[in-house]
């Protein structure tokens, strides 16, 4: 039998039902978003409640199990808005190094001259205050000298100057990652080193000698003694002292990069500079100011002795300390792919076995 054609009224009823279904399905996006947010809040609240219950049960079980209530294999989260994690700070060094290495040469030179001048201001202040203390109180004299010497590095960091010593740690991670060429790496070190020398000698000449800041007998003998003692140091001691100095200097600048607020930056830099200055470690940029000032005030040494006996070994030591004691370790641990040793890394062995 031939199939009957649907009537017009039946077709209209079906179309109306379909439209009603579609209107029921379609909802306001705001309502959907609010419903999703409510569901997510309920899930988060339930998770937090479960975590609180789990922590309370764990504390009840292990309250007397370990000495001083220290529980092994438990992670304690540290939440601070004023602190950047070491991993993130170390990865940031790659970007900082690339930025430094790709500066236009005049900008790089200007920032390095500024850094040499600002660091020398700290040297002026430390001599004026530290060497004014009687030499019988040698411990207090070293502490005061080191504390006010930190003013220079604080000014350099806050003004964004280019310092050879801190660049030893800040340039190597980006270079190891291939962010810039070998030519840019060595060019940056050379330009910054020369700019620091120009800035340091300018301050020692203008503010130190021409203004007669240290012509009194007490300061005159102290300034001469500083230069003569540094030049009389043997090559090996100057090299090792330079390594230790720049290790601490680079730590100070690195830790200041991980701090977000100004006070934290000033505190960490001041204490680490106080440490290396009190220990009488050698800083090549600081010595550019101190030895040039001592030479201008009649220190018993020649320019050749200054360069050969102090500037060269201390500069090499500073490069080793910043590059190999901080820059490369930070890059290896936090930036590079960790090189697993098969017979010492069980997780590496398991992953290799699964792939095979």
Swiss-Prot record:
<keyword id="KW-0813">Transport</keyword>
<dbReference type="InterPro" id="IPR024002">
    <property type="entry name" value="For/NO2_transpt_CS"/>
</dbReference>
<dbReference type="Pfam" id="PF01226">
    <property type="entry name" value="Form_Nir_trans"/>
</dbReference>
<keyword id="KW-0472">Membrane</keyword>
<feature type="transmembrane region" description="Helical">
    <location>
        <begin position="311"/>
        <end position="331"/>
    </location>
</feature>
<keyword id="KW-1133">Transmembrane helix</keyword>
<feature type="transmembrane region" description="Helical">
    <location>
        <begin position="183"/>
        <end position="203"/>
    </location>
</feature>
<feature type="transmembrane region" description="Helical">
    <location>
        <begin position="266"/>
        <end position="286"/>
    </location>
</feature>
<dbReference type="GO" id="GO:0015707">
    <property type="term" value="P:nitrite transport"/>
</dbReference>
<feature type="topological domain" description="Cytoplasmic">
    <location>
        <begin position="164"/>
        <end position="182"/>
    </location>
</feature>
<dbReference type="InterPro" id="IPR023271">
    <property type="entry name" value="Aquaporin-like"/>
</dbReference>
<feature type="transmembrane region" description="Helical">
    <location>
        <begin position="109"/>
        <end position="129"/>
    </location>
</feature>
<feature type="topological domain" description="Cytoplasmic">
    <location>
        <begin position="332"/>
        <end position="356"/>
    </location>
</feature>
<keyword id="KW-0812">Transmembrane</keyword>
<feature type="transmembrane region" description="Helical">
    <location>
        <begin position="238"/>
        <end position="258"/>
    </location>
</feature>
<comment type="subunit">
    <text>Homopentamer.</text>
</comment>
<comment type="function">
    <text>Monocarboxylate-proton symporter; active in acidic-to-neutral pH range. Transports formate, acetate and L-lactate.</text>
</comment>
<protein>
    <recommendedName>
        <fullName>Formate-nitrite transporter</fullName>
    </recommendedName>
</protein>
<feature type="topological domain" description="Cytoplasmic">
    <location>
        <begin position="259"/>
        <end position="265"/>
    </location>
</feature>
<comment type="similarity">
    <text>Belongs to the FNT transporter (TC 1.A.16) family.</text>
</comment>
<feature type="topological domain" description="Extracellular">
    <location>
        <begin position="130"/>
        <end position="142"/>
    </location>
</feature>
<feature type="topological domain" description="Extracellular">
    <location>
        <begin position="287"/>
        <end position="310"/>
    </location>
</feature>
<feature type="transmembrane region" description="Helical">
    <location>
        <begin position="143"/>
        <end position="163"/>
    </location>
</feature>
<dbReference type="GO" id="GO:0015513">
    <property type="term" value="F:high-affinity secondary active nitrite transmembrane transporter activity"/>
</dbReference>
<dbReference type="GO" id="GO:0005886">
    <property type="term" value="C:plasma membrane"/>
</dbReference>
<dbReference type="InterPro" id="IPR000292">
    <property type="entry name" value="For/NO2_transpt"/>
</dbReference>
<feature type="topological domain" description="Extracellular">
    <location>
        <begin position="204"/>
        <end position="237"/>
    </location>
</feature>
<feature type="topological domain" description="Cytoplasmic">
    <location>
        <begin position="1"/>
        <end position="108"/>
    </location>
</feature>
């Amino acid at each position: 039998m031939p199939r009957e054609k649907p009537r017009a009224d039946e077709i209209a009823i079906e179309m109306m039902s379909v439209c009603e279904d579609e209107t029921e399905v379609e909802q306001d996006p705001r309502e959907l978003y609010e419903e999703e947010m409510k569901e997510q809040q309920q899930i988060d609240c339930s998770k937090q409640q479960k975590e609180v219950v789990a922590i309370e049960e764990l504390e009840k079980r292990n309250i007397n199990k370990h000495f001083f209530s220290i529980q092994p294999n438990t992670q304690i989260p540290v939440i601070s808005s004023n602190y950047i994690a070491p991993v993130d700070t170390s990865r940031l060094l790659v970007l900082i190094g690339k930025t430094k290495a790709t500066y236009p040469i005049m900008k790089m030179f200007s920032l390095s001259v500024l850094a040499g001048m600002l660091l020398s201001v700290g040297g002026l202040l430390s001599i004026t205050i530290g060497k004014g203390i009687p030499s019988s109180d040698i411990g207090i004299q070293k502490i005061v000298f080191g504390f006010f010497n930190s003013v220079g590095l604080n000014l350099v960091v806050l003004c964004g100057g280019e310092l050879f010593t801190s660049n030893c740690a800040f340039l190597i991670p980006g270079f190891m990652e291939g962010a810039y060429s070998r030519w840019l790496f060595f060019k940056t070190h050379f330009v910054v080193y020369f700019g620091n020398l120009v800035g340091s000698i300018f301050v020692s000449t203008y503010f130190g000698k021409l203004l007669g800041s240290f012509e009194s007998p007490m300061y005159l003998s102290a300034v001469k003694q500083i230069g003569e003692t540094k030049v009389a140091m043997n090559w090996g001691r100057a090299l090792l002292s330079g390594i230790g100095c720049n290790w601490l200097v680079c730590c100070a600048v690195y830790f200041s990069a991980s701090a977000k607020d100004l006070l934290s930056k000033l505190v960490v830099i001041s204490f680490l500079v106080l440490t290396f200055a009190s220990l009488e470690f050698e800083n090549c940029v600081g010595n550019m100011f101190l030895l040039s000032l001592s030479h201008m005030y009649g220190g018993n040494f020649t320019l050749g002795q200054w360069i050969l006996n102090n500037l060269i070994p201390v500069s090499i030591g500073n490069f080793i300390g910043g590059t190999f004691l901080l820059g490369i370790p930070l890059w290896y641990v936090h930036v590079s792919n960790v090189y697993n040793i098969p017979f010492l890394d069980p997780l590496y062995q398991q992953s290799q076995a699964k792939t095979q």
